[in-house]
């Protein structure tokens, strides 16, 4: 499943295609959304927000389309009039004069009013988004030490969207390697230096992944661009200590780590 950085990049692509342009045609597959087709035609997409792995498409009339891709959903951008060759099932089409965005295969799709946004079960449940620039390491540290989370092992906590939205398995693996900890630790057992390092890594690594993953490191500046240090690198040497990276299972997900320098 895509994690927060991938979801945010997808939202950026969708925004670049249709934000601020009048919608010339709107189509929904689900019967309960059909009444909104005429209400949205002629309106503008004002912004596309991410809340962890959910997308919120905000319209100029105050409505918001909530969608969660789950395992199989995918958004695509096409030129208006193009007919994509795909076996996927179309769920949403938002069309402008020159670009159209399409949502395939997703089933978790709703239209929300401004009031419903504040009471939606998933949105109420998720924690602050790691890609929200307003979120600070100090706030993350306070969250780590809160009664709700301080006794949770990191193996499960870093996959829990109620703790921080947008984290997932590869981020869990890379964050714990960065701070030299195993997944069995709990926040209540860390010293001040470890807490500070983890609080920063929980924001720095997702944000680095969002801004640079997939780019070529032309200047060869070590650490300037995101790349996997341990994820999917079992059997290779750890670049920090030379130990051999191992693969195991934690919280029912593949976990990669260096037993030599992660304690």
Curated annotation (Swiss-Prot):
Explain how, and how many, cofactor molecules are bound. Binds 1 zinc ion per subunit.
Q: Which reaction does it catalyse?
A: 2'-deoxyribonucleotide-(2'-deoxyribose 5'-phosphate)-2'-deoxyribonucleotide-DNA = a 3'-end 2'-deoxyribonucleotide-(2,3-dehydro-2,3-deoxyribose 5'-phosphate)-DNA + a 5'-end 5'-phospho-2'-deoxyribonucleoside-DNA + H(+)
InterPro entries on file: DNA_glyclase/AP_lyase_DNA-bd, DNA_glyclase_Znf_dom_DNA_BS, EcNei-like_N, Endonuclease-VIII, FPG_cat, MutM-like_N-ter, Ribosomal_uS13-like_H2TH, Znf_DNA_glyclase/AP_lyase
Q: What cofactor does this one take? A: Zn(2+)
**Residues the entry annotates as binding DNA:** 70, 125, 169
Q: Which SUPFAM superfamilies match?
A: Glucocorticoid receptor-like (DNA-binding domain) (SSF57716), N-terminal domain of MutM-like DNA repair proteins (SSF81624), S13-like H2TH domain (SSF46946)
MF terms (GO), sorted A to Z: class I DNA-(apurinic or apyrimidinic site) endonuclease activity; damaged DNA binding; oxidized pyrimidine nucleobase lesion DNA N-glycosylase activity; zinc ion binding
A biological process term (GO) from this entry: base-excision repair
Q: Which UniProt keywords apply?
A: DNA damage, DNA repair, DNA-binding, Glycosidase, Hydrolase, Lyase, Metal-binding, Multifunctional enzyme, Zinc, Zinc-finger
Q: Where are the zinc fingers (FPG-type)?
A: 229-263
Q: Recorded E.C. number(s)? A: 3.2.2.-, 4.2.99.18
The catalytic residues are 2 (schiff-base intermediate with dna), 3 (proton donor), 53 (proton donor), 253 (proton donor)
**What protein family does this chain belong to?**
Belongs to the FPG family.
Q: What does this protein do?
A: Involved in base excision repair of DNA damaged by oxidation or by mutagenic agents. Acts as a DNA glycosylase that recognizes and removes damaged bases. Has a preference for oxidized pyrimidines, such as thymine glycol, 5,6-dihydrouracil and 5,6-dihydrothymine. Has AP (apurinic/apyrimidinic) lyase activity and introduces nicks in the DNA strand. Cleaves the DNA backbone by beta-delta elimination to generate a single-strand break at the site of the removed base with both 3'- and 5'-phosphates.
Write down what this protein is called. Endonuclease 8
Organism expressing this protein natively: Salmonella heidelberg (strain SL476)
Q: Which gene encodes it?
A: nei
């Amino acid at each position: 499943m895509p994690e927060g950085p991938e979801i945010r990049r997808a939202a950026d692509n969708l925004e670049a295609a249709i934000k601020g342009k009048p919608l010339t045609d709107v189509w929904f597959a689900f019967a309960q959304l059909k009444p909104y087709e005429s209400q949205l035609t002629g309106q503008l997409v004002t912004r596309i927000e991410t809340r962890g792995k959910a997308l919120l498409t905000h319209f100029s009339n105050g409505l918001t389309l909530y969608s969660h891709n789950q395992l199989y959903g995918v958004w695509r951008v096409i030129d208006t009039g193009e007919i994509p060759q795909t076996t996927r099932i179309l769920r949403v089409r938002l069309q402008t004069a020159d670009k159209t965005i399409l949502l395939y295969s997703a089933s978790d799709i709703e239209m929300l009013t401004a009031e419903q946004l504040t009471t939606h079960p998933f949105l109420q449940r998720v924690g602050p988004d790691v890609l929200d620039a307003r979120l600070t390491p100090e706030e993350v540290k306070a969250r780590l030490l809160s009664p709700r989370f301080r006794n949770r092992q990191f193996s499960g906590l870093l996959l829990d969207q109620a703790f921080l939205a947008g984290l997932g398995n590869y981020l869990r693996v890379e964050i714990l390697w960065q701070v030299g900890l195993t997944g069995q630790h709990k926040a209540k057992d860390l010293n001040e230096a470890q807490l500070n390092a983890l609080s920063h890594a929980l924001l720095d690594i997702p944000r680095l992944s969002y801004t640079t993953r997939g780019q070529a490191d032309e200047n060869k500046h070590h650490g300037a661009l995101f790349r996997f240090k341990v994820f999917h690198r079992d059997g290779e040497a750890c670049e920090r200590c030379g130990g051999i990276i191992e693969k195991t299972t934690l919280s029912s997900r593949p976990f990669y780590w260096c037993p030599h320098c992660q304690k």
